[in-house]
């Protein structure tokens, strides 16, 4: 396990702020000082195809970060700086189709952030129709192309993934195909038709990738649920519950220093 990942394992907090489109920027993160182990900003578009898709999503009334690509590098430096006021590590969630077009922005992110998180999670049709977001986990060769180049950035690379989009065996096989090129998995334990997380699949995934950092996500809004998911993950992440102001349990969990 490399030194950067060892440092992540030594973090004394167990809750991560998950990315929420159009919401989790530096100004949002800085409001939560000393609450999270990691704050994730984004997701951000790094090329013209995803930028256009993002603008199209906004036309449907959904929030997005549609940042002018020419202004992105200066924008992201400022957002990371603000996010650091949370006293957490800063992860940046990104998406792109053309890694060559995205690469100068990835270089800027790598210079200023602690973690780069590749979005293999988005299910908006404007994104999935480009073959990325959750569709990326079906295309191991494209995923490997992206990760091979991202590995050169010399930063921990995490994948934000969604369970139950493809069969678990296929997901594991495709992740094994790129195993040498990523350091962590941010796992949305999405369970279609169920009001709770798919813990069984998370357990299998965590056992298969026990050399990686695992962040569990989905429906975590209490100490009890967090502790249950932490049986199979190194961290848990939260999103919508934060928008409801439900943070006291996180403070209590931090005090336990588990």
Curated annotation (Swiss-Prot):
Name the Pfam families on file: Dus
Family annotation (InterPro entries): Aldolase_TIM, DUS-like_FMN-bd, MJ0144_FMN, tRNA_dU_NifR3-rel
Q: Which NCBIfam families match?
A: nifR3_rel_arch
What is the name of the protein in this document? Answer: Uncharacterized protein MJ0144
What is the organism field in this record?
Methanocaldococcus jannaschii (strain ATCC 43067 / DSM 2661 / JAL-1 / JCM 10045 / NBRC 100440)
């Amino acid at each position: 396990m490399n030194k950067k990942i060892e440092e992540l394992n030594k973090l004394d907090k167990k809750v991560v702020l998950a990315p929420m489109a159009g919401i989790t920027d530096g100004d949002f993160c800085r409001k939560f000082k000393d609450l999270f182990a990691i704050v994730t900003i984004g997701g951000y578009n790094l090329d013209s195809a995803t930028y256009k898709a993002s603008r199209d999503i906004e036309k449907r009334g959904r929030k997005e970060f549609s940042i002018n690509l020419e202004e992105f590098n200066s924008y992201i430096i400022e957002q990371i700086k603000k996010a650091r006021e949370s006293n957490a590590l800063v992860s940046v969630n990104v998406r792109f189709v053309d890694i060559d077009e995205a690469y100068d922005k990835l270089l800027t992110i790598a210079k200023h952030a602690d973690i780069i998180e590749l979005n293999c999670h988005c299910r908006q049709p404007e994104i999935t129709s480009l073959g990325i977001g959750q569709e990326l986990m079906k295309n191991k060769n494209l995923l490997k192309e992206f990760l091979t180049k991202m590995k050169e950035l010399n930063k921990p690379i995490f994948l934000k993934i969604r369970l139950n989009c493809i069969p678990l065996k296929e997901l594991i096989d495709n992740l094994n195909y790129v195993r040498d090129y990523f350091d962590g998995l941010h796992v949305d334990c999405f369970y279609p038709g169920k009001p709770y997380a798919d813990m069984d699949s998370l357990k299998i995934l965590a056992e298969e990738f026990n050399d990686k950092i695992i962040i569990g996500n989905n429906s975590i809004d209490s100490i009890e649920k967090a502790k249950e998911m932490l049986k199979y993950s190194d961290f848990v992440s939260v999103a919508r519950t934060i928008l409801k102001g439900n943070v006291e349990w996180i403070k209590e969990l931090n005090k336990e220093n588990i």
